[in-house]
Amino acid sequence: MHNTAVILAAGLGTRMKSSRPKVLHHIAGRPMLAHLLAACKTAFAATVVVTGPDMDEVARAAAPHPTVIQRERLGTAHAALAAADHFGAGAVTLVYGDNPLVTGPTLQRLGARLGAGDAALVLLGTRPPEPGAFGRIIGPAGFAERIVEFADATEAERAVGLCNVGGFSAAAADMRRWLGNIGNDNAKGEYYLTDLVAVARAEGASVAVVEAPWDECRGVNSRAELAAAEAAMQSRLRAAALAAGVTMTAPETVFLAADTALAADVTIEPHVVFGPGVTVGPDVTIRAFSHLEGCAISAGAIIGPYARLRPGSDIGAGAHVGNFVELKAARLGAGAKANHLTYLGDAEIGPRANIGAGTITCNYDGFAKHRTTIGADAFIGSDVALVAPVSVGDRAIIAAGSVITDPVAADALALARGRQVEKPGRAAELRMTKGKR
């Protein structure tokens, strides 16, 4: 049957103190909304996102999924009802856009519990280490009779550890009806999604509870909670990498993106940061204090320490990128080496080429970027400036200190620096002259 997820993403997130919509704040290199969309993709046939007025950025981030606008912010139930035309004929699951850590398997469990047939409504619950002001789920094991807000709870109810964190599944027809029956007789005059339980129970419906780990159910309403969610996501990503055969000598200092792809037998030293779009092949070593984003690293390469790989970098098998070396939109061929203090931008470096310390590809003329091509087995001496567009042929040698502006043929030696001049005795004369003053 066609099942649909509805992500409620219309909130302003005022406690974030940001001009950016809350669901577009990043965790592990991608917006919170993107994490939810990825989880929903594994559990539902369709996903729709509810946004608010003037939230075009959220609609663009949700594409190609459809969006609907909650014209007035009158509460979470009102937001869900705005998407009623998208519920379809199967089951529908409502999730909050600021719960980015929930996983696809947990969402699948909600649907499976609904499919068991002994409950018409299923909600997601968790047991936080500090339940605090969360609403408590009251009922026999596995079921809910009501949700009691903390302010209204008795001491006995406050002692209950099972808390409501959002996430509701029901048949589409039931969900439409129950949402329409929720009232706004409360201090704020809003329509609250948590009242679904009371409305369903008033019809005699049974309400089941699916429990999920706390680290999947963290809400993000402030910068502090965003940092806590980031820490939880990083722990999850590190654990998955370690289980897949990656070595991290100090895992707590390594920061991964949600899409970081690490092969088995990769070794990562402390204080390495992965931005989005990094793929690392087997037997690669990434040394300490390196920063990588938007790059591909082939088997057996060695990166760092203190290396920076920027978007478009492609490191060949067995290549070396050493300390204080930066690459951007550059391919380093198999076995090539750039071991010290080098910038290679918009460049193609052939296999086994050796790039000396202090080499710079001068790729920007103030108006446009230009490419540098260095052939296989070429040797670039230290402190060389390659003024693009320029090419260096296979097996060519560039003398240290050269400024290369013209093509260098294969097997050629190129020197482009002033000739050294020596004046015997002149140093002694200068000392005498300076000393008399």
From Swiss-Prot:
Chain spans, region Pyrophosphorylase: 1-223
EC number(s) per UniProt? Answer: 2.7.7.23, 2.3.1.157
Query: What keywords sit in the KW lines?
Result: Acyltransferase, Cell shape, Cell wall biogenesis/degradation, Cytoplasm, Magnesium, Metal-binding, Multifunctional enzyme, Nucleotidyltransferase, Peptidoglycan synthesis, Repeat, Transferase
Against PROSITE patterns, the record matches this protein to: HEXAPEP_TRANSFERASES
Which GO molecular-function terms appear in the entry? glucosamine-1-phosphate N-acetyltransferase activity; magnesium ion binding; UDP-N-acetylglucosamine diphosphorylase activity
| Residues annotated to bind UDP-N-acetyl-alpha-D-glucosamine | 8-11, 22, 70, 75-76, 96-98, 135, 149, 164, 221, 310, 328, 343, 354
Can you state which reaction this protein catalyses? alpha-D-glucosamine 1-phosphate + acetyl-CoA = N-acetyl-alpha-D-glucosamine 1-phosphate + CoA + H(+); N-acetyl-alpha-D-glucosamine 1-phosphate + UTP + H(+) = UDP-N-acetyl-alpha-D-glucosamine + diphosphate
Q: Which cysteines are joined by disulfide bonds?
A: none
Q: What's the chief localization of this chain?
A: cytoplasm
How is the cofactor bound, in the record's words? Answer: Binds 1 Mg(2+) ion per subunit.
Q: What is known about what this protein does?
A: Catalyzes the last two sequential reactions in the de novo biosynthetic pathway for UDP-N-acetylglucosamine (UDP-GlcNAc). The C-terminal domain catalyzes the transfer of acetyl group from acetyl coenzyme A to glucosamine-1-phosphate (GlcN-1-P) to produce N-acetylglucosamine-1-phosphate (GlcNAc-1-P), which is converted into UDP-GlcNAc by the transfer of uridine 5-monophosphate (from uridine 5-triphosphate), a reaction catalyzed by the N-terminal domain.
UniProt lists the family membership as follows: In the N-terminal section; belongs to the N-acetylglucosamine-1-phosphate uridyltransferase family. In the C-terminal section; belongs to the transferase hexapeptide repeat family.
Protein name (record) = Bifunctional protein GlmU
Q: Which gene encodes it?
A: glmU
